[in-house]
Amino acid sequence: MEGQPIHKPVLLREVIELLGIRPGMKILDATVGLGGHSRGMLEAAGGEGQVLGLDRDREALSEAGRWLAPYGDRVRLVRTRSSRFPAVLAEAGWEKVDAALLDAGMSSLQLDDPERGFGFLHDGPLDMRMGAEDGGETAEGLVNLASYARLCEIIREYGEDPQAGRIARAIVSVREKEAITTTARLAEVVWQAYPAKWRATARQHPATRTFQALRMAVNEELAELEAFLKAIPDHLAPGGRVAVISFHSLEDRLVKRAFRAEATDCICPREQVVCVCGHRARLRILTKKPVMAGEEEVRDNSRARSAKLRVAERLPDAGADVAG
């Protein structure tokens, strides 16, 4: 198609292959972003394939609408959180889907706009909300109002930063004198909090992990992912597949555990001699290890370097007729 966007969806070929996209499929893109994955899946699904795309970012959804417009009524876009997909499916009259995708990454549209506050290459307000129209806590509010203990926990858990304590103390110390309201100021505070020897040898700016941690906290990203993973098996047709692309070790571990639990018949504690949970496997894991981008894709799109793809397939319901 002409006029393709600069946006490059990560692991697109692998997503299409592992989801088994074929003509006529009903596809849920729970984080449509700029529409790159949806466009690729629509092409693979042929003239009868349909995509229901969700995103809570109004700007991203608007861009996706422009690039997906040539597909007409084969695409329906809804501004909402990925965790709310069951209600959207019901409204669309889709009882089950044949394929579902969730990409937990950020789009260049979000990262490159200083007014959104996701990065610090250019100064801007400390916002970081993906769905600003919905209100909610901003990064500025979190930085200036959260206790030392909460800041430390957020930066340590979501940013996996060994200097979390020093950074949290520095933030609290600075905000006692003046509010921290911009991305540049926060980046400066974090920079100064790092030991000089760490700054000298760091492979990335010391503030990178803190910004990631605050963004994940503001947008409740792990809770959103967990809710999606819990609900999706109920909404996959037998043989339907779900793919999740993560960019953070916490996200990947969450996906791995969720898939493993749904691929296991009994989830009772190990000390339980007799099964009492009644749980039966609903998924079959198709990726024993996460699929990662090859060297060529990483050269072409550095964002793909940390992407990890896991895929699982819906098993027939217990008692269903699976005979040929």
Curated annotation (Swiss-Prot):
Job of this protein: Specifically methylates the N4 position of cytidine in position 1402 (C1402) of 16S rRNA.
Subcellular location per the Swiss-Prot or TrEMBL entry: Cytoplasm
As recorded in UniProt, its EC number(s) are 2.1.1.199
**Family assignment?**
Belongs to the methyltransferase superfamily. RsmH family.
Q: Which domain of life is it from?
A: Bacteria
The first-level EC class reads transferase
- The reply on keyword Hydrolase is no
Name of protein: Ribosomal RNA small subunit methyltransferase H
Q: Which UniProt keywords apply?
A: Cytoplasm, Methyltransferase, rRNA processing, S-adenosyl-L-methionine, Transferase
Chief subcellular location equals cytoplasm
Q: Which reactions fall under this protein's catalytic activity?
A: cytidine(1402) in 16S rRNA + S-adenosyl-L-methionine = N(4)-methylcytidine(1402) in 16S rRNA + S-adenosyl-L-homocysteine + H(+)
What's an example Gene Ontology biological process for this entry?
rRNA base methylation
